[in-house]
């Protein structure tokens, strides 16, 4: 018994030791929390980002693509960005990579407008159905109120009168409230047409009727609502009404007319506005502009005709005056004064012709100097003049040529025959006229070949030429005959006659006009060039006799130069084109192979025309000077 306290203390110590061991083992066996990331560091920002990204995966933003929008013009988007519209009023530069990454939806502006139109039509349909339900609910409330008033017990006569007065006021308030509801409904449905005069009178009569009539009005409203049948759910076929509003189907249009007591008809199929109406208005505007333009043109033509008539009268008067002067010269009266008057009359005539040529001119004929196979020619380039040009009225001054000042005065010999009419070619000798005819024929052939090489197809002349007419003359006649009437007028020959480098062209052309009617027909034109020669034949005719040791060109049947030309006395040969222009580095003793040289020159000239590089020191044409060795 003495050892009992010791035993108790030992037991207590054992119990404490065992409990401590058990606690340590439990602490060792307890698992450590590693978290969602497997024991790694956790960041709150990353978790939030992951959650936000998971939420955004299900949402795809819609963008509107409209390259022609005015909102995108001030934005300077980068190369890898594109301008898109968030809505109708805001534009943003969006990265293409982000669009692909987020899988955003991009729609066109037309699709967006179509969806908006469908949404508005659906809203309008829902509003119509809601209006019909509201009207039905109001009618049910009115009928319930009327039934309760009729079933209420009646007392004295005063009480009945007061009840009837209250019913009248209630009915008036209800009718007014119904009228207000109808007006608000009309605004919600975008109903723009005004109420017909008959409907207004009916409403006023209904409001002015005594209290005994509400039951009749309610019955009429119920009958109208029963007649307005709602539309079933079906695939929409959009229609544009006469009120410029879009309806989803014909049933919706009828339902709208039934509710609002209107008679709106179908304007066209599809969304409003109708294209036919827009096109019709556009055609009306265009027709109005055309009418104004035609009136202006007719006035201008009338003024031009009046001016032409006045000029013709002036020309006829000038001819009469010239004839009178000739008679006076024949009688021997005041010889010197008559000569001066005749010169002034001729100058006035040429000035009037020049002015007449430029009144109705639709083109200006600008001389352009070109080179063809080492030879200079003048080619008439047709260019349209500008309407607002300050030189429009006096276009002949643009050529720096004043015919009145530079033209020499014609001097008549006192001993000459007074009965003879002064010749138009008095300033040029017959030899000069023959030479200018040969040069013109050679020039016509060059222009014809150049136009064929350039593949410029001129209009075929409908005029009839004599059988013996030369090809160059026929081609040039069709080239100058702009209106294709078979006659060359003063206007069409103006630039050809008034060449400042060739003063004998106009006298030569004047000799062609045999009937002196100020125009040249095909017969006169061909006869004028009948006695002219082509370049080689012209040189041989000019040489006249065969001098000892003189060079005589070798011509073909048509009168052009043969490719190979030889000087027999010297023993030298060279190659030329058909106009007599010598090819460089071809002069040799013996006969060279001129056909290959001509073919190579033709290909080179076509390349030179494309590059615009020509030799400025080339020799002139064969008809301009005689070859002397």
UniProtKB/Swiss-Prot annotation:
It is found in: Secreted. The keyword Aminoacyl-tRNA synthetase does not apply. Disruption phenotype: Predominantly embryonic lethal with 50% of embryos dying before cuticle formation and 10% showing a weak denticle belt fusion phenotype. RNAi-mediated knockdown in the developing wing results in development of ectopic chemosensory bristles along or near the wing margin on both the anterior and posterior sides. Residues 222-273 form the Kazal-like domain. Residues 118-186, 198-223, 298-356, 602-629 are annotated as: Disordered. One of its GO terms (biological process) is establishment of protein localization to extracellular region. Residues 1-27 form the signal peptide. This is Proteoglycan Cow. It comes from Drosophila melanogaster. The gene is Cow.
């Amino acid at each position: 018994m003495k050892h009992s306290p010791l035993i108790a203390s030992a037991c207590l110590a054992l119990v404490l030791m065992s409990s401590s061991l058990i606690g340590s083992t439990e602490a060792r066996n307890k698992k450590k929390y590693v978290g969602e990331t497997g024991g790694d560091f956790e960041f709150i920002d990353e978790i939030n980002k992951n959650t936000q990204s998971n939420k955004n995966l299900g949402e795809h933003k819609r963008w509107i693509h409209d390259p022609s929008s005015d909102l995108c013009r001030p934005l300077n988007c980068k190369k890898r960005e594109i301008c898109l519209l968030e809505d109708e009023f805001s534009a943003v530069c969006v990265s293409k990579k982000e669009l692909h990454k987020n899988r955003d939806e991009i729609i066109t502006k037309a699709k967006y407008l179509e969806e908006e139109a469908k949404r508005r039509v659906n809203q309008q349909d829902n509003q119509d159905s809601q209006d019909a339900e509201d009207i039905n609910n109001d009618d049910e409330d009115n009928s319930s109120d009327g039934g309760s008033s009729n079933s209420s017990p009646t007392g004295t006569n005063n009480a009945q009168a007061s009840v009837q007065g209250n019913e009248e006021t209630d009915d008036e308030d209800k009718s007014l409230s119904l009228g207000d509801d109808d007006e608000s409904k009309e605004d919600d449905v975008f109903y723009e047409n005004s109420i017909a005069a008959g409907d207004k009178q009916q409403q006023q009569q209904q409001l002015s009727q005594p209290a005994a009539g509400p039951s009749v009005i309610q019955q009429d409203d119920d009958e109208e609502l029963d007649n307005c049948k709602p539309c079933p759910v079906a695939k929409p076929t959009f229609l544009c009404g006469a009120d410029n509003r879009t309806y989803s189907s014909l049933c919706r249009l009828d339902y709208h007319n039934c509710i609002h007591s209107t008679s709106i008809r179908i304007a066209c199929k599809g969304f409003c506005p109708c294209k036919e109406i827009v096109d019709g208005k556009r055609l009306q505007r265009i027709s109005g502009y055309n009418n104004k333009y035609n009136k202006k043109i007719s006035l201008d033509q009338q003024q031009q005709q009046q001016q032409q008539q006045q000029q013709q009268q002036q020309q006829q008067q000038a001819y009469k005056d010239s004839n009178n002067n000739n008679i006076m010269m024949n009688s021997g009266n005041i010889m010197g004064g008559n000569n001066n008057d005749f010169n002034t009359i001729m100058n006035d005539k040429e000035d009037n012709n020049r002015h007449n040529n430029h009144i109705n001119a639709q083109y200006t004929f600008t001389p352009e100097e070109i080179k063809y196979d080492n030879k200079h020619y003048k080619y008439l380039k047709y260019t349209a003049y500008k309407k607002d040009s300050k030189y429009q009225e006096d276009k002949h001054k643009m050529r720096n040529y004043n015919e009145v000042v530079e033209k020499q005065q014609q001097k008549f010999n006192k001993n000459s025959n007074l009965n003879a009419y002064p010749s138009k070619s008095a300033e040029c000798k017959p030899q000069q006229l023959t030479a200018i005819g040969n040069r013109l024929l050679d020039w016509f052939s060059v222009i014809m070949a150049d136009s064929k090489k350039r593949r410029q197809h001129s209009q075929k002349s409908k005029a009839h030429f004599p059988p013996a007419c030369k090809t160059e003359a026929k081609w040039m006649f069709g080239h100058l005959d702009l209106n294709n009437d078979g006659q060359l007028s003063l206007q069409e020959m103006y630039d050809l006659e008034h060449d400042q480098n060739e003063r004998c062209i106009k006298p030569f052309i004047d000799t062609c006009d045999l009937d002196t009617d100020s125009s040249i027909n095909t017969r006169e034109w061909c006869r004028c060039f009948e006695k002219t020669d082509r370049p080689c034949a012209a040189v041989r005719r000019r040489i006249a006799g065969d001098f000892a040791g003189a060079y005589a060109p070798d011509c073909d049947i048509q009168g052009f130069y043969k490719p190979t030309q030889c000087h027999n006395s010297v023993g030298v040969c060279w190659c030329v084109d058909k106009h007599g222009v010598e090819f460089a580095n071809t002069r040799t003793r013996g006969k060279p192979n001129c056909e290959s040289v001509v073919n190579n020159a033709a290909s080179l000239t076509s390349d030179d025309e494309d590059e615009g590089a020509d030799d400025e020191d080339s020799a002139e044409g064969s008809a301009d000077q005689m070859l002397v060795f």
